[in-house]
């Protein structure tokens, strides 16, 4: 691997940042060199960090494909904008994260929208780049939208399960090939210990306004056109035996009873008997093609709301759920004035030291917010990252990442 000295790399990054065109609320910007003792690869892509306000120290992961050479990158950065670890997978990575034991996991990506390619898997690697294992769902191809660690060491994954449905009332074929959304919980040995499928729980009618897009954008599988009426994109363990999922093609987030499989509540989308009444939200339709529904440390539901085809900017929106009272109470939102639209993708995660980290989907921008909801930094990337994911507290350190980089460099040779 060709490398250049960190000082020259810093100069290169500064020049690349100058072409980003981003505003600077505090009137200052910074672009950071490689970690001490390391050389940035010569082909390291453009990287512009805009420092605006102080932010607690922390680490996070971004992934993207270089726009010029199409080379995939998994990068761990600190909140000061210094790349601390990087890796070039053999296939593009949809998104990545540091796991609680310090290993890194990312979803392979083959540009198919969801899991259609049998090579699909989550790669789990050590900090020195060694492949530890591949993780896949059972009975159908794993999808790349979710890999959620649980406290007991199990993981929640999603898969898109093929089936047949009559879509004539929506303008589709009589015997259409579709995919339903399935959640699987796998133990450490890869055994499925719990699963749930949207079949019989999310009606095809809930796809609503998305049917035109779904029917006009099928995927091909086994020489057939396959339609995706649900499109699950996140899974989150909830409270009181609940699992929370986000499904883009229904504009909704659902709370699922693990014991019965029944839907306890629904937020957004077309109204059903489980729908929550939204209180106080300035948006008349609360969600639009949303992603990354999570519970924060205060128990609030947080959602990256793309606002797809809605008359508003993308936002991170907060709700206090009251299923017993049948309502969801709006608790605020975050925006970045540099982002006016978001067709897909995106994430919103709490920073361990306080504040929020937001990937704006198909925009090449990550924004850090402080605890008061003010923009603390922007990371301008050469291409979009599906998610930006903070590392769990205590999972790894700059020293460990530095050691892993050193071992990879030694193995690669001069």
PLM region descriptions:
Residues 1-8:
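Bacterial N-terminal signal peptides that target proteins for export
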Residues 16-19:
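C-terminal motif of bacterial Sec signal peptides marking the signal peptidase cleavage site
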Residues 26-414:
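Histidine-/acidic-rich catalytic cores in large beta-rich domains
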């Amino acid at each position: 691997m060709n490398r250049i000295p960190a000082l020259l790399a810093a100069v290169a990054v500064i020049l690349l940042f100058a072409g980003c065109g981003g505003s600077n609320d505090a009137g200052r910007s910074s672009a950071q060199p490689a970690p001490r003792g390391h050389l940035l690869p010569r082909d390291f892509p453009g990287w512009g960090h805009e420092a605006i306000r102080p932010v607690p120290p922390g680490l996070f992961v971004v992934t993207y494909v270089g726009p010029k050479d199409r080379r995939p990158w998994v990068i761990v950065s600190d909140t000061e904008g210094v790349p601390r670890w990087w890796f070039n997978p053999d296939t593009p990575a949809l998104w990545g994260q540091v796991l609680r034991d310090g290993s890194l996991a990312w979803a392979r990506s083959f540009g198919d929208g969801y899991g259609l390619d049998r090579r699909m898997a989550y790669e789990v690697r050590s900090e020195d780049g060694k492949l530890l294992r591949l993780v896949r769902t059972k009975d159908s191809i794993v999808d790349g939208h979710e890999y959620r660690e649980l406290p007991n060491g199990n993981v929640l994954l999603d898969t898109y399960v093929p089936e047949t449905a009559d879509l004539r009332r929506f303008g589709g074929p009589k015997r259409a090939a579709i995919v339903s959304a399935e959640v699987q919980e796998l133990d450490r040995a890869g055994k499925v210990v719990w699963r749930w499928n949207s079949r019989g729980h999310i009606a095809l009618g809930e796809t609503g306004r998305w049917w035109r897009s779904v029917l006009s954008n099928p995927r091909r599988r086994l020489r057939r056109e396959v339609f995706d009426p649900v499109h699950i994109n996140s899974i989150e363990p909830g409270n009181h035996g609940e699992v929370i999922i986000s499904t883009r093609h229904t504009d909704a987030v659902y709370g699922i009873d693990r014991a019965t499989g029944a839907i306890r509540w629904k937020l957004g989308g077309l109204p059903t008997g489980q729908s929550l009444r939204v209180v106080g939200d300035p948006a008349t339709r609360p969600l639009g093609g949303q992603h990354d529904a999570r519970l924060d440390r205060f128990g609030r539901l947080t959602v990256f709301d793309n606002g797809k085809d809605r008359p508003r900017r993308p936002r991170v929106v907060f709700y206090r759920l009251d299923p017993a009272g049948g309502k969801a109470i709006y608790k605020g939102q975050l925006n970045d004035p540099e982002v006016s639209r978001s067709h897909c993708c995106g994430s919103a995660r709490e920073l361990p030291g306080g504040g929020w980290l937001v990937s704006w989907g198909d925009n090449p921008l990550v924004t850090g917010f402080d605890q008061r909801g003010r923009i603390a930094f922007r990371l301008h990337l050469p291409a979009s990252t599906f998610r930006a994911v903070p590392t769990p507290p205590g999972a790894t350190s700059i020293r460990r990442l530095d050691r892993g980089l050193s071992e990879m460099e030694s193995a690669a040779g001069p």
